[in-house]
Amino acid sequence: MTNKELQAIRKLLMLDVSEAAEHIGRVSARSWQYWESGRSAVPDDVEQEMLDLASVRIEMMSAIDKRLADGERPKLRFYNKLDEYLADNPDHNVIGWRLSQSVAALYYTEGHADLI
């Protein structure tokens, strides 16, 4: 994975550098910035986890696409705060929250869903 690909996926998932560094790379934010700048190579395990998260996002989108195909206009929860998300999803973490935000924002901005 190139540095630009890493940054593109991180931004698509709505993760900031510190969140990605802590929860995916388990490194300092500075190390993550080195990967994104191209100063250091992206480790294979980080590449795989980012690709896995992008796949999870696609699965989430597929579930919404099925609802749309059935004629439903989904109402998607957009959590402003991590604490709100965790109250409804206690087994998740910041990564799940950001994935949820990413998908909800996409469908809302494309006019396919309402946010609640």
Swiss-Prot record:
InterPro entries: Aca2_YdiL-like, Lambda_DNA-bd_dom_sf, YdiL_sf
Protein residues bound to DNA: 34
Source domain of life: Viruses
Pfam families: Aca2_YdiL
Keyword field: DNA-binding, Metal-binding, Repressor, RNA-binding
Reported effect, residue 34 to A: Loss of regulation by Aca2 at the transcription level
Listed Gene3D superfamilies: Putative cytoplasmic protein
Binding annotation for Mg(2+): 92
Biological role: Represses the expression of the acrIF8-aca2 operon. Regulates the transcription and translation of phage anti-CRISPR acrIF8 gene (AC H9C181), which is necessary because the expression of this gene rises rapidely upon infection to enable evasion from host CRISPR-Cas defense but is probably toxic to the host cell. Aca2 repressor can inhibit acrIF8 transcriptionally through DNA binding to 2 inverted repeats in the promoter region and translationally by binding conserved RNA stem-loops on mRNAs thereby blocking ribosome access.
Name of the protein: Aca2 repressor
Native source species: Pectobacterium phage ZF40 (Bacteriophage ZF40)
